[in-house]
Amino acid sequence: MSSAPQLLGDAVASAASSMLAALRPGAVTRVHKFGGSSVADAVRIRSLAPLVDDGADVRVVVVSAMAGTTNALVAMAEQAASGQDWSGEWSALRERHLATADEIDGDGRHGLRDAVARDFDGLRDDLLALASATGDTAPLVAQVHGTGELASSRLVQAALGGEAGGWQRLDAREVLVVHPGEMGVGVDWEASRERFADWRARQQPAAVVVTGFVACERDGRCTTLGRNGSDYSAAIFANLFDASELLIWTDV
């Protein structure tokens, strides 16, 4: 498997390139982004630690969902909305993530299994709500679609050492505000910078794992950046963290 980083691959929107150009050269922050194949199982997740141990003053890791997870979540949302049974797919995906949690946190010191189980309890509740919902279901659908990043970010945080090892976790929906744009989702930079500054002042992180793909609207409703949006997330957070470098890793 290759461990060579690819700087802003083809999947990144053109807007991401302009954001990187705006990064200040004097920053001492490095952002790493890992896609679904790089967090596909416990072995690959554990292999990330030496890649991000790069000597930067601030290290940021943006993660996608485990390989195949988003496709499964999209299918479950469609099944729920159309009145079909989604329980088998939910159980299988839950067990895959719990098994990975057990491999990473076998002694339970990070409380990883319980945290991931809560994510899937929330997914089940969202699917039940979606099955009976009327009107605008877009926020519910977005919550379902983004569950994979919530869980994978927990897995990666624990594998890197967890809070005891200095690694914090940021749910991007806490700070990243977006709106519909002419070429897809656009960033509300004013709102995002304000929320990010507040979060950073409280946390003062030197190492943080961030959920890719997910965001929120100004009214707090959950949304996403669209398929393959985690590269876009990485570019956005490189800007917010004033990073000197963004590395997008593939197939590690």
Identify what each model region corresponds to.
Residues 1-252:
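Nucleotide/pyrophosphate-binding catalytic subdomain
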